[in-house]
Amino acid sequence: MHYKRTFLRRLVPAALVAAPILLMAACASIDCAMTTAVGCRYALRGDTVHDTLTILAERPGSSDSVLVNRLVQPQAFTIPMSYGADRDQLVFQLTDTLGTTRTDTVTVFKTNDPHFESVDCPARFFHTLTEVTTTHHAIDSIVIAHPNIDYDEKENLLIYFHPRR
């Protein structure tokens, strides 16, 4: 009987110490991303060093959104992709030092691929660029350099501008 009491006196403190350690080991630390959107990286080529760039997103059924507001001397930037639509339509407004603005509409066609990291985190959408079209007021051409849009910060689209006149 005396041995049972001694055993229980030692078991209870040991259990109180071991229980939190076991509970912490059972819990997983999950760092979910704050946003579920990934971005398309645009790199500008040509004579845009002195220009100012504004980019608007045209969303059917809603108001336009300013994504980039008066970026001075643009060389590259990242714009988040929509994850519900099969295309994103952007309006590029390039203003030179004399105040002349040239506007182009760029349409990016893509697939939306859900990407799951953990059941505790919301799905992210990766994208595959399939086609890009543009008007040609300031933009000469757009080339898909890397079609897969994911966590990597690589240049996905290369935008070539007409030379200044």
Language-model features and meaning:
Residues 2, 42, 161-165:
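Signal peptide-directed secreted proteins
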Residues 21-45:
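Bacterial Sec signal peptide processing site at the extreme N-terminus
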Residues 27-32, 78-165:
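Extracytoplasmic cysteine-anchoring/structural motifs
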Residues 39, 50-54, 87-89:
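Exposed beta-strand and adjacent loop surfaces of beta-rich binding modules
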Residues 44-46, 57-61, 94-99:
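Short acidic, glycine-rich loop/turn motifs
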